[in-house]
């Protein structure tokens, strides 16, 4: 039987999603909890492997199991065995053709900026603090150059293992709610560090250090060294993964919780 789960986690205490030797990861914690409930070893596959310090409100995973359990066992039962900063949000038995990564048609991330002179105390691991006068309208204007299928070499990590730098950005918006600025971006897929590298460069525009057209120029240059530094990890959230409607997966609010959808 193949089961899909919606997962939420605070990634600030983990060395990323993917299981690694001798460090604490979200995947390892989730697999341990699932294995307890299933009474057999469970291995999960995820929609997107988040880096150290990155969060998720809309991560999707799937796994195979011989165990027959009620839905509450895969939600409440698994949550009892998880640390407080990881939670199952929903469960659904899916067809064998479903794959959390390969049947996904799009991913959506939100990057949360706390724009204030003083750093936050609460939410310090859930937002990235950037002081100074940030013009979010210029960031939004510059971000529109990212739309469509393009070569994102200037915004990929140096050690990115993808075979191609081309990705298709479906939509991107930069909005403000008081002291919070949200960079909301949806694409068919993302390169390693792509969102954080984009945000780092958009911030240069918002702070007035670069022109709106600079983003267009960076895309044309296809050179990571010409773009800005990578933005901090703690403001980044994987908020949604899109699948064909035929799978009828649950739809929940995107989050993070302090955002008004």
Curated annotation (Swiss-Prot):
Species, as recorded: Shewanella pealeana (strain ATCC 700345 / ANG-SQ1)
NCBIfam families: hisT_truA
Family, per entry: Belongs to the tRNA pseudouridine synthase TruA family.
Top-rank EC class of the record's enzyme: isomerase
Entry's Gene Ontology BP terms: tRNA pseudouridine synthesis
InterPro entries the record matches: PsdUridine_synth_cat_dom_sf (IPR020103), PsdUridine_synth_TruA (IPR001406), PsdUridine_synth_TruA_a/b_dom (IPR020097), PsdUridine_synth_TruA_C (IPR020095), TruA/RsuA/RluB/E/F_N (IPR020094)
Function: Formation of pseudouridine at positions 38, 39 and 40 in the anticodon stem and loop of transfer RNAs.
Enzyme Commission number(s) of this protein: 5.4.99.12
Catalytic activity: uridine(38/39/40) in tRNA = pseudouridine(38/39/40) in tRNA
Upper taxonomic lineage: Bacteria, Pseudomonadati, Pseudomonadota, Gammaproteobacteria, Alteromonadales
Protein name as catalogued: tRNA pseudouridine synthase A
Key word Cell membrane present: no
Record: active site: 51
Tree of life domain: Bacteria
GO molecular function, one term: tRNA pseudouridine(38-40) synthase activity
Complex formation: Homodimer.
Residues binding substrate, per UniProt: 109
Record key words, sorted: Isomerase, tRNA processing
